[in-house]
Amino acid sequence: MDKNSKVCVTGASGYIGSFLVKELLHRGYTVHATLRNLGEPSKVGLLKGLPHAETRLKLFEADIYDHDAFALAIQDCQVVIHLATPFQHNTHNTEYKNTSEAAVAGVKSIVQSCLRSESVKRLVYTGSVVAASPLNNDGSGFKDSIDETCWTPLNLSFSYCDDFFHDYVHSKTLAEREVLSFNGKGIEVVSLACGLVGGDTLQSFIAGSMGVLISQLTNDSAKYRILRFMEELLGKLPILHIQDAVEAHIFCMENPHINGRILCASNFLKTADIASHVQKCYPEIRISQEFIEDTKRETGWGSKKLEEMGFQYRYDLEKIVEDSLHCARRMGITPEN
């Protein structure tokens, strides 16, 4: 892929999005970045302050609830990386009754804008592993392993699940199915279903996923509940470093032989294993027993698609935890001792 190419990144001011824009600019790409509101100084300032932003970054205002707004940002781009997703339903919007309808309509509109542009050849959609639960459809237990063939059975109720995550799981699952239905129909579609991401951040606050990842260290009951929800949904916890997440997106963007669905995580482990690692490597951090629950579950990680195409993860569990902990301390969030 020509490094002079233009790449559109939706949801560019988010946790993954900001790192992705930074790396794309570093590699010489011109980036069309969308934000919900160009009137937010912190988000605009973050992106405008990146190296090479002055010459190769163009910002566009676009909301997932206003689909036509993305067309201008997509025009003249060769690739679109679609990270933007509605986390909470806009109650002022009467066109969609929930986040699932908005997310599905959003990816459909993005694809249609890509096709109308006549310049976009590839769409990389940032999915989530919450759409790939290895639970049996009847809720009787888990399959032996999780891979790209797994789809979360939306007819089931999930342990530790509240209304927010019920809606999130449904919206990510339905939106991913929708975007993949366009693969090979005038555009190459890659859905990169990422695990829980940790590491560093460019934002001025701890990203939600990182806060969840280190919730055992900080004794944060609310975020630990989310961690356990993901473990009960997926069998174990798939995690990866932010730098690996960014590299995987660019790898899928630049590799013309990749399309379809790909799961993305460097580690797949029990939450009890995370606690055990922390207690071994950071003996000064005491984790309360209520944050250590061993499921004894042995669900395997069966996805090798990304590695078989030549991708290599560079960050292991030790580095993910180390960088997440360092970032949290920098933000003033210190583990309970």
Spans of model-derived segments:
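Mid/C-terminal beta-alpha module of Rossmann-like enzyme folds, strongest
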Residues: 246-296, 300, 325-328, 332-337
